[in-house]
Amino acid sequence: MKRIQIISATAAALMLAPLHAQETHSGAAKPAIRQIKIISSAGARALADACSAWAEQNKQTVAIAILDWGGNLVESHAMEGAGANSIDTALLKAKSALRWRRPTSEMNKIVRTGQNLAPTFMHDFPQPGALPIMVDDQMIGAMGVSGADGEKCAQAAIDSVFKASPKPATQ
């Protein structure tokens, strides 16, 4: 019995030791836990409202899907007159922008030119209309918009709510 306890304690210590601190190339310890920013439901609602206002001002009808950093739907909204599949399209676009960490218009160009067809095989939707939501160089979610000028609508909303947070870097 004592032998099993010793083996169990040793195994636990070996498994947990890497979590305490890891060395980086510079020799500094990396923390075992990092803090992340997440979009709140109020923030997501504000994005949807700002995008809807932009669309109305530009005489457009849109549907909007906003995901948190883990891909969970935080907010969705379809303006009156939006097509029956508009929310689904906005959601697919948002998921694609989140997974690839880039605007879906960039993904569309990559697929159309044949540089990378992976997005089409991975059930992504590389059509323009979605952006990653970046705050302080950290992706906190993604916003997909179905309707004309979807990325312009999303960027206007992100700029409005997050006071012109930097656009995601293209790779």
Q: PLM ranges: what are they?
A:
Residues 8-18:
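Bacterial N-terminal signal peptides
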Residues 22-171:
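Flexible, solvent-exposed loop/hinge segments and secondary-structure transition points
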Residues 1-8:
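Bacterial N-terminal signal peptides that target proteins for export
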